[in-house]
């Protein structure tokens, strides 16, 4: 393991990108490789609310959900040790959030082709804000500029293991 990566124990690695970009899968594999705890903000919210993300959106609305995301991020930022964090796709879009994440660690944008991401999640019924491919592309286009402000951008069109290797390589080259 690269010496730089071993020094990440006090820094968070935030994985951002569209739903379907592989944040959870890549995050879990990456956490095993570099021996840091893994957190998925959507899973944390579902657990604390006792509802799926889709149910939260449909019963309480997007604004309420975004407030839960901010609270979840605050809890993560208060942690004393580094973690791999799979962020909900809209979390970095919230005003000030990207800056907070960059101060607390490294933000990695998992850049996947919108059509590939859409196809990965099309069969899942628990995803909010997902309609036809055109609306998915519009959502992607509305978020891409913010995503590009990440510290690191990695192509996420390959297999999970290929993407993990790309992320690890990028982390070893990142200037702290």
Q: Where are each of the predicted segments found?
A:
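ATP-dependent small-molecule kinase phosphotransfer cores
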Residues: 41-90, 95-100, 146
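ATP-binding Walker
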Residues: 21
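Short glycine-rich anion-binding loops that position phosphate/pyrophosphate groups of nucleotides
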Residues: 88-91, 113-115, 159
């Amino acid at each position: 393991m690269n010496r730089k990566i071993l020094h990440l124990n006090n820094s968070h690695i935030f994985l951002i990108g569209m739903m379907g970009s592989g944040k959870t899968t890549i995050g879990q594999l990456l956490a095993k490789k570099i021996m840091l705890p893994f957190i998925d903000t959507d899973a944390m919210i579902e657990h604390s609310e006792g509802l799926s993300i889709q149910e939260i959106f449909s019963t309480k609305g997007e604004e309420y959900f975004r407030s839960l995301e901010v609270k979840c991020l605050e809890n993560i930022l208060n942690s004393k040790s580094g973690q791999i964090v799979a962020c909900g796709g809209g979390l970095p879009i919230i005003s000030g959030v990207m800056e907070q994440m960059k101060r607390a660690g490294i933000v990695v944008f998992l850049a996947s082709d919108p059509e590939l991401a859409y196809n990965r999640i099309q069969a899942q019924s628990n995803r909010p804000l997902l309609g036809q491919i055109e609306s998915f592309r519009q959502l992607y286009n509305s978020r891409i500029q913010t995503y590009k402000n990440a510290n690191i951008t990695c192509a996420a069109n390959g297999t999970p293991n290929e993407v993990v290797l790309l992320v690890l390589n990028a982390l070893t080259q990142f200037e702290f």
